[in-house]
Amino acid sequence: MSAARLGFVTPKKPPYYLITALLLSLPNAALAVGACDKTEKSSRCEDSLTVQASSQPQSTYGSLEVVTQLASRLGLTNLETPRSIDVISAQAIQQRGDKSLAAVVERAPGMSGVASPTLSNNFSLRGFRPVSWLYNGVETPGSTLQLADPSHYGSVEVLRGPGSVLNGLSAAGGSVNLLSRQPTFSRQPIEFDYGLSSYNSQRLHLGAGGTLVDDVAAYRLDVSGSDSGTNVQYERDKQKRVSGALLFKLSDYALLTLSLDRMLNRTNNPYYGTPLMEGNIARELRDINYNNLTDSRIQSNATSFQASLDWFTTPEIELHNQFYYYSGFREWRNVERFRISAATQPGYVNRDSFGALAHDDDLIGNRSSLVFDRPLGGFDNRFIVGFDLSKRRFQYYSNGFPGSEEVPLQAPIRESFSQGTASQRSPVRHVTQNQYAAFMEDRFSLTERLTLLGQLRYNHMDMDWHFQGPQEERSAQTYAFSVWSLGPSYALTDNINIYANYTTGKEPGNDLFFLSPAQTGLPLTRVRQWEVGAKGQFWDNKGEATLALYELRKDNLFVPNAQQPDTLNAVGQQTSRGVELSLMLRPSDRWELAANAAYTHARYDEYRGGNPLRSYNGNRPAYIPDWTANLTARYMPTEQWGLTSSLRYVGSSYNDDANQRKMPSYTTLDLATDYQITRTVGVGVRIRNVTNQLYAYQRTYPDQVLIAPSRTYESFISVRF
């Protein structure tokens, strides 16, 4: 590993990635320029630019008219797609003041979970965890994206259920697609957002965009930074992010978009949890940080580059090409397990697992597709065919989590990492994944109101594991599989659709990049889902509602041991059934309501575990609540003054597979008020966790929980000019 990376700076890499992108994109663009008839179809490129600009949600919470990318690449709206999708607009993110992606997605129907130092992607949907994360439609490794400032996104899409037909190996429960803010030729205001909150926390966002050269080039640029603390001693988080994009109108038919995103993050003394006292949360320990080492940190950096060519060759044929590159590095240096029961002295706590580890991740790939929009046998038909090539390299370093010591429970000693262990990280495994895939979709209109969406993907993947250390070992495996989806959609009216869908998927039994040598020969997990639902607008488009019922099943899977997160247990079959409902109302210009609720009945069907061995059949998986619900209401007494309240309910869940340790349900309340001083300047105040409720939202070890942040206040100013 280079000294530059150890110093929290990603080393400069050769520019051949950028050159490759341009070579892939520009030859096609040149053809488009040559073939362009500017008099006959000059409006077509203008229309495409308008579509690109308006594909983001225009209202705060309504999303059925939005063109989505997460469930189909055919350019269908949410209403037209026979899958359950939620779209969170940039306006909603800003109005709620979401500081993180966790805050953005946790209010989506059925979403539950947490992002924490030890469980960076422990979100669940439809009874399964984790979820997949995509950036502009590309499934992206690592957890750095989840730490990034959400003000850089034009919208965030949430798909419930498998996404394998679009992305190959993908989480069964659902996927989240982060769509960056895009350049357009229409005027975009200059944006300034600043917030000052509890614990001397600050955050800043600057944004601008618009035309560089009339009808030739446009840009979008966003810059953000934050420095925040919490009620937990010594914990401090700093983030920096710059993202930008250039849009070139190569001809009346061709558009080229180049985007670059750079993220930096460092958290000193991250909170790893609080030890339980006789199985209960002790309020007096709420603010104590047992990971108070003088050099404790988590730091990461990531760079993403994408080049997208959209060529509208004829009114019936489109070519799309997307080159993508991602490089991320993240390192940890912490002590993370705390047990009162293991201490030999009264009034002390044992802390162990002094971990020094790092992830080094690189992904490069290219996706190309052709879209045909022409009648078939007299019926409207839209068809896409394409291929996807990618290569990912992953290097994992660890010190094995040694070290143990006892410290006073009320005042743990603050010392350096080396006092707990002298063991430093070393290479553990190097994994390479080479993948190619072919995919197709077809939306066939059987009648004016009845359509059928079919999707098929073939995936071929070569994996190579190099296990490093005292006993070096190599292993290789080839995976080849096909997945498909089929779903009819029927328009009861112009604004109300009902649909059904059956989709299959594949998922690794565990993360392929963290398999042990003995696990590399295991088959992939099989995923199947049935879904029926309805979605529509009503009351003169003042209301939107969605309803989905589903059954989701996985065979031959692994689940993390609830008491030992680094240990995996084999499960033969797990099934989840449930219902999800969302409602959005705009009764008047002064009122806006958004509500959703989800019931999840997740159970193990075939699972034996524990010591001694026993059946867990019929038990609920750990960390999966049965009910979740969200309600957001906004009232404007005047045109300038707004009041917002948000309620969130998460039902009880178990922290173990035996269903013996139960985590109680909780309800939180957030309040906000804002005032538009002038047409360009607005100010406001937010209060999070108004009731200062004390509750645990996750258990990382048997006798250790993550306690939710205490009440916080934030004042903010937003300027648009």
Locations of regions flagged by a protein language model:
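C-terminal beta-signal and adjacent terminal beta-strands/loops
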Residues: 649-656, 674-721
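Face-selective signature of the C-terminal outer-membrane beta-barrel domain
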Residues: 305-328, 352-467, 546, 594
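Structural signature of Gram-negative outer-membrane beta-barrels, strongest in the C-terminal barrel
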Residues: 247-251, 255, 361, 380-384, ...
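Membrane-embedded beta-barrel scaffold of Gram-negative outer-membrane proteins
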Residues: 308-312, 316-324, 328-336, 491, ...
